[in-house]
Amino acid sequence: MGNYQNAINQAQQTGGAPNVTGVRKATQSSWGYGFNIEQAISDDVGIFGRWSWNPGTTEAQTVDISRSLSGGVSIKGSRWSRPKDTVGIGYAANGVSSSQISYLQQGGMAAFIGDGALSYKKEQIFETFYSAKVYKELFISADYQRIANPAYNSARGPVNFFGLRAHIEM
């Protein structure tokens, strides 16, 4: 993994945009922590909350998130005579570290983001879904997501995503 500040320093010496691939070290490591809580409020209602943090000094191997806070609620369909159905709503706010912001603003590319024109603002995601049991073990879910400041850029978005999923339980 490469260190963002090392890539910035190298770019200042050589010119051009910072690039973490040029400063990768086999011994580089990263760390972080996360907390998750899920709680049934009743037989039909559940809530969740998650919080995670890492220093954000090195490139990511999975997602470009240094800190995240999310929460939501799900309600089973028993209240409207559809006990196998579920409706849910959730919200997440994600951010990156100051060294990654600087790296991206100077033209660096991360695992999934970067175009050299970062106007940083926290990414905010709203999601809602409805999962319906349509036949025996077949469930169909409709999903909507709205992302404000996608890829941490206030000059982008918001974007809307609509999804349809099928799930079979065996």
Where are these regions (language model features)?
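Hydrophobic, lipid-facing positions within transmembrane beta-strands of outer-membrane proteins
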Residues: 31-35, 51, 67-73, 124-128, ...
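Short loop/turn motifs that connect adjacent beta-strands in outer-membrane beta-barrel proteins
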Residues: 43-44, 77-87, 134-137
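Transmembrane beta-barrel strands of outer-membrane/channel proteins
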Residues: 47, 51-53, 71, 87-93, ...
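Residue-level signature of outer-membrane beta-barrel architecture
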Residues: 39, 75-77, 132, 168-170
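Outer-membrane beta-barrel "beta-signal"
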Residues: 89, 158-170
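Sequence/structural signature of outer-membrane beta-barrel proteins
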Residues: 1-2, 54-59, 96-98, 147-151
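Surface-exposed beta-loop-beta
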Residues: 1-36
